[in-house]
Amino acid sequence: MAAEEKDPLSYFAAYGSSSSSDSESSDEEKETENAKNRAAKRPFPTEAKKLPGPDELFRSVSRPAFLYNPLNKQIDWESRVKRAPEEPAKEFKIWKTNAVPPPESYQVAEKKAPPPELDMAIKWSNVYQDNGDDAPHANQAKCLPEEEAQEDSPPSDDEQEKAFATKKRKV
């Protein structure tokens, strides 16, 4: 039996030898038969310990040793439970966003009115320094002709004196 249980790699070592082909075929047949017999006799290696079967295991062990309490025969599962620490309630913080606020909280920012600008004709005239007689000038707009404007407004004392002085000069 010791001859049969030689090194399992010897099969491959004999395969590469340079002996005659007849002896190789007979050696190969013997090796394959021996390998089949060995496989049928030992399905698992004998060197490793076998695990006990389920029936045998449950007959010998009823519960783990760390749970055994000789004073109380029942297992206190509540004392074994591990709970996560409770987190404190989170405070609500308003997120800072660039989003448009809802309509009820939206207040239109009042913008200042743009400064009164010059007429573009006057502005361009100043840019190009076109200050001739026909250049536009910034004067008060006149809606009524001069004659009607004088009739509507009562003449002041200064205007009456000037008008009287001009009449005297003309004569």
From Swiss-Prot:
Region (Disordered): 1-56, 126-171
Biased composition regions of type Basic and acidic residues, renumbered to the chain: 47-56
Disulfide bonds: none
UniProt biased composition (Acidic residues): 146-160
Family: Belongs to the UPF0690 family.
Domain of life according to the entry: Eukaryota
UniProt name for this protein: UPF0690 protein C1orf52 homolog A
Pfam families (UniProt xref): DUF4660 (PF15559)
